[in-house]
Every structure is written in structure tokens, then in C-alpha cells.
Amino acid sequence: PEVGGLPVPSRLRIIAWGNSYHAGMWGQHLLENWARMPVVPEIASEFRYRNVILEPDDMVLVISQSGETADTLAALRLAKEKGCIAIALCNVVGSSIPREADAVIYTQAGPEISVASTKAMCSQMVIMALIALYYGQRKGLLDAKTRHEALAALHGLPKQIEDALPAMRETAQMLSPLYASAHSFFYLGRGHAFPLALEGALKLKEISYIHAEGYASGEMKHGPIALIEPEFPTFALAFNDALFPNCLLYTS
């Protein structure tokens, strides 16, 4: 209902920063797959200082947990000056970005207490999936089976996470002593796992104060592999999809 009265954009620019930018990158894959919509993720602090080319039928989606991120707010204002429709995806109700946007979708995740965004980031990803499903259906490109399966998977997600957390904590406790002395980490991902690799590296930096870099798996051979040594941990995010064999190849 938040975007139901707005036209379907010919191109969507997702403008965000940090965790929100990674959520936007992840959403790009879903929008391209389900809605066949051209999507350009933009880092807010870069977007606002470029001589950006925006068309009147472009739409801008700005993502911010706080709704007060200065660079994202400035990018929103720039887009509106150029005549673009602007949608805000925010968590804090009544903050500056939602007030200035043409439409707003609230994640309603509650106050974000931790330094590293957790529930806000997860909520943004869920909303991005719903947006992709909505536009895919509205454009008549998404079959009912895919939509129903995706919605059922989203409904089952809380239970899946709850069931998986004990084993994940146990694994983390087992691995942490092995890698506690490491000075750098790589996080690798391909396709829609790449934004999550970037997010994993950011989380390690924010929480543990350890240097980490996220890379697209295929980019390893173009320089970063030169840094790999026996005591350089690498985490590979490899989903069980068509890219799985390829990810294993680069990981090995």
C-alpha cells in the first residue's frame, strides 16, 4: 500500500550507506530477477557529489536505519530536485528522511541497540524481497508459484533462524580460538552472496576491530589472492544454487 499509488519506474536507484547499502545491493538481485527492473545501487556519500544523470521517470529508494544519515538525506534532496519520485525505507518513525520522501516504508524493527546493525539490516532485506515480489507481480512477470514459495519462506524464516542459532553459536565458539590471533580476513561471495560477504567483513571490523575485506569470489584471482597465506582465514559464502560449483572452485 505504501507504493501502490506510484508509477512503476523505468529504473530504480537504491541510495544508502554501510549496512543499508549492502541490503540494497542484495535487493538489486531480487528486483532484477523477479521484476526485471534495472537497478543501480549507489553509495550515498558518492552519489551526492557526482554530476548524476537522473531521468524524470527514474525512482529513488533511499535506505537508512535512523532516517537521519546526512549523506543519504542530501542524496534524497538531490534526487527530488531533479524531479524523481523518492521512497524512503527507514526504521525510525518521523525522522527527517521519511518526512521528506514521497512515500515511506517503515521496517518497524524497534530501536537498534547494538553497534553493528543486526535486526534493522535483516528487516531491510525482508522489505527488499517484498518490494521485488510486489513489482514482479505488478508487471505481470512473477508467476503465482514463485510468489507463494517466496512468501512462505519469509514466514518460516524466524523459526529457521531460531532453530539454527544454537548450532551457529557452538560453531562460533569452536572457531574463535583458532582465528583469534589472525590480523586479516577475507569474506568471499558471488551473486547475491557478494553483498553478504561485504556485510560479514564489515561486522567483523565493527565488532572485533580486526581488518577484514569482502570480495566477489571471481575477483580473487585479480590481485587479492597474492595476500593469501596459511594463516590468513577466508570465509566463503556459497549458497546451494547454480553458482555453488563455481564458488567452491575459487574457494579451493
Predicted regions and their residues:
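Short, glycine/polar-rich helix-capping loops at beta-to-alpha or helix-loop-helix junctions
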Residues: 49-50, 88-100, 222-223
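Active-site phosphate/pyrophosphate-binding segments
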Residues: 1-13, 93, 103-235, 243
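Pre-Walker A segment
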Residues: 2-19, 25, 39-40
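Short, structured coil segments at secondary-structure junctions
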Residues: 35, 56, 82, 99-101, ...
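Glycine-rich oxoanion-binding loops at beta->alpha junctions
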Residues: 28, 32-63, 211-227
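Conserved small/polar residues in nucleotide/adenosyl-binding loops
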Residues: 250-251
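A structural-propensity feature for long, helix-poor, extended segments
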Residues: 59-66, 230-240
